Regions:
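RNase H-like nuclease fold core
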Residues: 1-51, 55, 62-68, 140, ...
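RNase H catalytic domain
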Residues: 11-17, 58-137, 146
């Protein structure tokens, strides 16, 4: 099983009703020691920062063409705590309901679970805007996508 590092970030302008984007950087080193990288990003007309954080992780995992060991780095506690604190398991058990009502962004959580399924994923939180080079790079990809001209429609925004 190949080892991959996935760095992700999401951004939204005027959260929750403004444009947003995500950025992701995949890195892996092949058997010759050569580092390979792939950047992913997209922007949306109207979305939220949490949806873009999830989309960054989804895009990165969906870009993998075989099962991998993945270290996923995100500055989103919403994303990392859902897995590291076991929230996602409780949400699924309770049919996507919490004590305070339905879980938000069910469409993306379900898609993320499908994308994660063939891989072994470790979710790692990094402090945002604290000088971590790859987090900063993903932030730049996300904000550039949000500010771009070719914005997509986020069908899951209500």
């Amino acid at each position: 099983m190949g080892k991959v590092m996935l760095f992700t970030d999401g951004a939204a302008r005027g959260n929750p009703d403004g444009p947003g984007g995500y950025g992701a950087v995949l890195q892996f080193t092949d058997s010759t020691g050569t580092l390979h990288e792939k950047e992913l990003s997209a922007g949306y007309v109207r979305t939220t920062n949490n949806r873009m954080e999830l989309m960054a992780a989804i895009a990165g995992l969906e870009a993998l063409n075989r099962p991998c060991e993945v270290e996923l780095y995100s500055d989103s506690k919403y994303l990392t705590d859902a897995f590291n604190q076991g929230w996602i398991d409780k949400w699924v058990e309770n049919n996507w309901k919490r004590k305070t009502g339905p879980v938000k962004n069910i469409d993306l959580w379900e898609r993320l679970l499908r994308a994660k399924n063939p891989h072994r994923v470790k979710f790692c939180w990094v402090k945002g805007h604290a000088g971590h080079p790859l987090n900063e790079r993903c932030d730049k990809l996300a904000t550039s996508a949000a500010d771009g001209d070719n914005l997509l429609v986020d069908e899951g925004v209500t």
